[in-house]
From Swiss-Prot:
Pathway: Lipid metabolism; fatty acid beta-oxidation. This is Fatty acid oxidation complex subunit alpha. The gene is fadB. It holds the Pfam family 3HCDH. SUPFAM superfamilies: 6-phosphogluconate dehydrogenase C-terminal domain-like, ClpP/crotonase, NAD(P)-binding Rossmann-fold domains. One of its GO terms (molecular function) is 3-hydroxybutyryl-CoA epimerase activity. Residues 311-729 are annotated as: 3-hydroxyacyl-CoA dehydrogenase.
Amino acid sequence: MLYKGDTLYLNWLEDGIAELVFDAPGSVNKLDTATVASLGHALDVLEKQHDLKALLLRSEKAAFIVGADITEFLSLFQVPAEQLSQWLHFANSVFNRLEDLPVPTLCAINGYALGGGCECVLATDFRLATPDARIGLPETKLGIMPGFGGSVRLPRLLGADSALEIIAAGKDITADAALKVGLVDAVVKPEKLIEGALRMLRQAIDGELDWQARRQPKLEPLRLSKIEATMSFTIAKGMVMQTAGKHYPAPMTAVKTIEAAAGLGRDEALALENKSFVPLARSSEARALVGIFLNDQYVKGLAKKLTKETETPKQAAVLGAGIMGGGIAYQSAWKGVPVIMKDINEKSLTLGISEASKLLNKQLERGKIDGLKLAGVIATIHPTLDYAGFERADVVVEAVVENPKVKKAVLAETEEKVRPDTVIASNTSTIPISELASVLKRPENFCGMHFFNPVHRMPLVEVIRGEKTSDATIAKVVSWASKMGKTPIVVNDCPGFFVNRVLFPYFAGFSQLLRDGADFRQIDKVMEKQFGWPMGPAYLLDVVGIDTAHHAQAVMAAGFPQRMQKDYRDAIDALFDAGRFGQKNGKGFYAYQEDSKGKPRKVPDDAVDSLLAEVSQPKRAFSDEEIVARMMIPMVNEVVRCLEEGIIASPAEADMALVYGLGFPPFHGGAFRWLDTQGSAKYLDMAQHYQHLGPLYEAPAGLRDKASHNAPYYPQVEPAQPVGELQTA
């Protein structure tokens, strides 16, 4: 053996051909700081081998390299800008040395080669991939851009257009797609990968393949005429502005960096990449997006730990068809758990099956499935008007009308029709689980399972623990939600649970602004364009349904009278009384018309202004800053209360529930990350400025305590060691 590090080793394969094998402890290879340093040590050894004729890079794992070690990012990005720049310069010098070896190099790619793994691949002369390989640069999804030469080598290898598409969108592509654009030289069966790699290297050694000619374009300026460059970069910038917008600077920075480096050789282009990377890495957007990635891993890890000894349900049932029931049935069947769908109404059953069929047909149209798969999934959804087959159900979810009397009657009846060990869950959005459990003989087998609409798109499922819910019940439901491809987050019981409990104070802030003379159109614009919500509050209420919100608002007011009981008639009341229920009947805050695809399109409707005038003071101007503060303080305060009361277990789970359940802008990272970014002391000052507006604006005790020493909610991340102490030599 020529060299053995902790995460890779170097060996002779055959006469003159060495292999560099990535083999980190654990299940996957990551390109962390230690591996970059170890790669440098391996190159020290290789550069001294006078009889070296070629180098093969491969992985001992099921994937080549899954990317950088993202757990290092938060601390690495905390180091001073100059030190981070120095470390990047060191890392790039390692990849340059790999690229500059005086012999042909080839990378044998199996599984994932993402981020730094892809950048390692790009430094070699030839690339072979197995059919399951996926190669790409997802950095912009984390608020950064490639930092190990990806923005330099990929455009020179593929051409500007293909490279810009991959880098700006943070895409990874299949082996076949990589072959088509020239990212790999061939796709070979896994069992033939090493054999094919050695054959290609021998051809390069013998001069049949010109490896030096393959390498040269990566060292030179991008081969683009002035007209081609103008077209490529203008189109790319336009697309990025349309898709990413101003809140996500990484994609635009990457495009502009590639454009600025187009006329430069490798080393000058890498210096530009370094210069662009460092400010992105130290931005609040990167901190938030990396935080979301880490929180997502944490939440998924909790679910995995919780269900370690739990068998995934083999048969499910849904009570109540229609859009929601049909969506749940589709998702369960699509992910491989057969489902019985019961309703008392034939029409509703037809609607439920129709909803599932519609979603499957969309998959068929997109080429994701064939007719056989479609028929197979539909065959596992069994519509019924009675309880036939319910004795087989491991888990049943009730999705009937949001009325406690109806739900209690249905739940009590269902309990008599299922096995004693069957878990029953309610898809209620606001009614306390312990209240619904009061009619059950086996309340320990009952919990809440709150899906979000549309079920097939929304990743979150709130799993609600009632007073008597057992751990086994929670584990069973979490297991089913995970099997359905959802992110389950366990919360404790209260009116509205977590997501709706924190959403309605946000709506209350909106109602108060309207009462005080604000224009709902301006509020929507500010909350969408400035704060970054996918929908402003007026538009969101129209989508949720004014009637639904009116009912839920009453439930929340009864549950939290001190804060959520209002003493005035608000905009939601006015629209509800006027029969303006939102998208469902074509008029709410806005009017709705069907577009060419049959989807509701928002259009202005001046008639609403006279209705709102009845419950509002005369119109007056509000600054964008005041609108954001008055909208967000009630929500953030309630989020903090939920943590303090143990409704939600951690800031990470709270932030993921907000991002996945409500569409909280990812570049803010969630309520706790947003609060930490401002600083708890500054946030408290803002809240106190508005506390005259009522109890929703009064900061909770725990927050006031944190603000007294400006403490964050997330653990303080210490900067990584200075670069001189990082493993750079």
